[in-house]
């Protein structure tokens, strides 16, 4: 079963989010780029009060851990993200895209 990851950051801006993606060589707007193996879905959003959320589904926690160790950790630093996120994992029991 796939795994759901929710990351909640305090004080991360849209500019920093875009910088991290540029460091990774991915473009969330077009879907093009060097997306990590094991990533199924990626969503990101900003909330009031300077909070940023990333919600992803992965084939396994191990696949995400490998991505974090080999690419994402360094890209976060180079992109200016120094805050440690709140991390929540859950087993994914449903994923639907009714609108397309």
Language-model regions: role of each:
Residues 1-70, 80-100:
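Short S/T/G/P-rich N-terminal loop/turn motif that feeds into the first structured element of a domain
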Residues 75-79:
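Short arginine-rich
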